[in-house]
Every structure is written in structure tokens, then in C-alpha cells.
């Protein structure tokens, strides 16, 4: 049996007899994700589905992100890397983009944000209707006030900081940005108890 990869994100699983004359499509191969954003020290498990045999995982830039023989990616330092998987019955390889951003403390984040007050003065219009401001992350694109929060986040946490969601108030910290009714975004400067 062999796997033929049509695109980096999806493979076609084919079965063939030993002389390669009778080939049949029997399924598809895929990875659980093709784009990962991590902070330094964090990990993400990659999985290759629909293949058999021993798979080989490799990082294009082990100084930025490593991957072990089971597909566990670890963020080492800020930058970009490509994680590829090959072997087994996979012909070719499949890849996942990894962006790593730096680890930063809440105190450092607040200090960096406050240092930007001269650049981002109060009273500037950063509404969603103002399409002049655009920002893009590895897993998000936006305009207006979200773009402002994204731009500040890039300067505080690094260009490849992940856009994540959580609903646990205790996890909110300086540097997080909060969406209010899907209409407006604010940047957290400091957390005091429940405010």
C-alpha cells in the first residue's frame, strides 16, 4: 500500500499489489493542523492520520522549533519553522507551518504597552469601519480596533504570537485583548481582582 499526496494538506491513500499494476484509492491522509502558533516553551502534538508504518518527523529550523519522533513540537525561540512528516506508506511528505513568539511576563507586557502611549495617542480613530488599519497573524486577519490590539501585541509579544480564545477570567493578563460584543476590542493594561 502507498499514499499519494496531492496537496501539502491532504493525501490520497492508495493500495497497490507488489508489481504496482493494480492500484486502488482506499482513503485519504491528513494532519490534525497545518498552521501552529506557539510561545517559547509551549508544545503542540501533531498527528498524521490515514497512514500506516513508521512516520519520520523533521523540523526545518530546530533552533526555532523541535519535533520528536511522535510528532510533539516544542517552541524553542521566536521565528518560523516548517514541520514535515514522511515515511511509512506516505509518498512524499505533509507539512505544518510553525510560528514561535517570545515568552514574556505580565509586568514586562504592561511596561512595553505603556511605553507605546506616545505612538498610539488617545483620541485616534481605530473603529472597525476604518479600513485604513489592517493586521494579520498566523491564524487571524482584521481591521480597526482589533488591528490596533494586534499591532500592539506584535510589539509586546513578537510577530508570531498566537490568537487564542479563553473564557476563564482568572487567565486574563496584561497584554490580552478582549472583544466586546464582537464590536470593539480593548487591550488589558492591568488586572485588579475582578476588574
Where are these regions (language model features)?
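Generic recognition of cysteine residues
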Residues: 2, 48, 96, 140-145, ...
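Secreted/periplasmic proteins that engage bacterial cell-wall peptidoglycan
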Residues: 105-192
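Basic/aromatic-rich interaction segments and small domains that mediate binding to polyanionic partners
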Residues: 195
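Extracytoplasmic soluble-region selector
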Residues: 3-103
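Generic detection of intrinsically disordered/low-complexity segments and helix-coil linkers/edges
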Residues: 1, 28, 40, 51, ...
Amino acid at each position: 500500500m502507498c499514499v499519494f499526496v496531492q496537496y501539502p494538506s491532504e493525501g490520497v491513500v492508495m493500495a497497490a499489489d507488489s508489481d504496482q499494476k493494480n492500484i486502488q484509492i482506499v482513503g485519504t491522509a491528513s494532519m490534525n493542523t497545518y498552521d501552529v502558533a506557539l510561545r517559547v516553551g509551549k508544545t503542540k502534538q501533531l498527528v498524521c492520520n490515514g497512514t500506516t508504518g513508521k512516520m519520520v518527523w523533521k523540523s526545518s529550523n530546530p533552533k526555532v522549533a523541535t519535533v520528536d519522533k511522535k510528532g510533539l513540537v516544542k517552541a524553542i525561540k521566536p521565528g518560523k519553522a516548517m514541520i514535515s512528516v514522511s515515511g511509512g506508506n506516505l509518498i512524499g511528505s505533509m507539512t505544518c507551518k510553525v510560528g514561535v513568539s517570545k515568552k514574556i511576563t505580565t509586568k514586562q507586557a504592561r511596561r512595553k504597552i505603556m511605553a507605546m502611549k506616545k505612538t498610539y495617542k488617545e483620541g485616534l480613530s481605530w473603529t472597525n469601519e476604518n479600513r485604513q488599519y489592517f493586521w494579520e497573524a498566523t491564524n487571524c486577519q482584521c481591521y480597526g480596533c482589533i488591528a490596533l490590539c494586534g499591532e500592539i501585541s506584535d510589539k509586546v509579544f513578537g510577530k508570531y504570537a498566537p490568537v487564542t480564545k479563553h473564557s476563564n477570567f482568572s487567565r486574563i493578563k496584561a497584554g490580552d485583548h478582549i472583544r466586546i460584543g464582537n464590536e470593539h476590542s480593548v487591550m488589558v493594561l492591568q488586572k485588579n481582582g475582578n476588574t
